[in-house]
Amino acid sequence: MAKIMIQGTASSVGKSLIVAALCRIFKQDGYSVCPFKSQNMSLNSYITLDGKEMGRAQVLQAYAAGLEPEVYMNPILLKPTSDKKSQIIVNGKVYGNSTAMEYHNLKIKFKDMLKEQFKKLEENFDIVVMEGAGSPAEINLRDRDIVNMGMAELVDAPVLLVGDIDKGGVFASLAGTMLLLNEGEKERVKGTIINKFRGDVEILKPGLDMLEDIIHIPCLGVVPYTRLQLEDEDGAVEFNKKTYAPIDIAVIKMPHISNFTDLDALKSEEDVSIRFVTSKEELKKPDLLIIPGSKNTIEDLLYLRQCGLEESIKEYSNDGRIIGICGGYQVLGSKIKDPHNVETDLGEIDGLNLLDMKTIFEKEKVTTRVSAKLLNEEAENTVYGYEIHMGISKYGQNINPLFKIYDKNGEKVGYFDGAINDKGNVMGTYIHGVFDGVAFREKIINELRVKKGLKKKKSQVYEHMREKELDKLADIVRQSLDMKKIYSIIGMK
């Protein structure tokens, strides 16, 4: 089996999409290929068909490889709960919460598990494309590294180093990274990749030659800056601003926002613009307000209260439209109780009281794949998604369920999810990916269009669009990189 590892000079240099591109290229060339990231840190996660939790970046990479996402592609997921603590997910299940120092001391225990997981991949795939995290030059973490050079050494993988030229300083970041690696680590790096380039490559070439003279490693290509409709799991996600889009969707950007990949399908609608809101002045009067998921719902509710957004949201709810997802759904209720101090030691807190329901946080985390039908609809309106939450919400007297769940992790069930007020303008659900399917997204956006005097439109199938964008990404990267050299590095062709 062949393997290659993509590392970067920093976070957000484009490692994840380079891995996705290589997965699609190798698949197109007839090889069975699998992505692998030993440890990911993200608040954007996904639930597999067997009810296990993994990072979203490896989900996209799995699709690029033509595979169903599985947790062996991302054995360890860290989900920050505060600046100093994270929830640790190991092989899809909650391992526990820990501080940075506690996890640093834990990492050595996971090495054997990671090696065993990777061995299984070696037995089942022609090529494994690995992804590092952050930078391999974090010299203070070297002795217990399990995600960059430590992982590459564990499975004897060659490394390609990616630098982001769009931020500036790419030559210094590549040379500086190499300077901080030890001799054994330097020998693993077989090439560099310049990512997100704008302009004339001819002007860049003298710099590439000088860089090669300094670090003695060839540049395998320059990938142009390209806007693609593919999800971005990094926390500082920025939505492309459209010059004009008649449908204005505002999203509350809370400090612990999670699973904002729920919005990606909405971004694909040509006449929809999405903007983040962090203050009451920014809210204005959107056509739709979305309160997204949160890794710390109580802290984010306190944030809404302290910054004045709570009152603005309540005022907007008089004639505006609001959808809450997961933590955002919990926020819309009358009360949140935390008897086990899952999030804080407050015990309980009043919600926005826009939906007549209460949430109680439990010790056990719910991680399920679900299929649901929108209630009170004549036409077939099926939603497929997943749930990731600690709380259980209970209805009051003056509330209507939004969905009926009929399938949970492949088993037939029959229970309600979500809620909608009598007026029909405030609703919430626990289902992540609720907009990914055509039916519900088309229904909501068409209702917004009609309200503004616009014509209804058919929504495109998000999965089809994603496949086209992955092919486009692969074409760009194939044209930009020396694929013959890369095949030589991994010992193929």
UniProtKB/Swiss-Prot annotation:
Pathway named in the protein's UniProt entry: Cofactor biosynthesis; adenosylcobalamin biosynthesis
Entry-linked Gene3D superfamilies: 3.40.50.880, P-loop containing nucleotide triphosphate hydrolases
Pfam families reported for this sequence: CbiA, GATase_3
GATase cobBQ-type domain location: 246-440
Cross-referenced PANTHER family: COBYRIC ACID SYNTHASE (PTHR21343:SF1), DETHIOBIOTIN SYNTHETASE (PTHR21343)
Key word Metal-binding present: no
Active site: C326, H432
Homology family: Belongs to the CobB/CobQ family. CobQ subfamily.
Name of the protein in its database record: Cobyric acid synthase
Lineage per the UniProt record: Bacteria, Bacillati, Bacillota, Clostridia, Eubacteriales
Record's keyword terms, sorted: Cobalamin biosynthesis, Glutamine amidotransferase
Keyword Ligase annotated: no
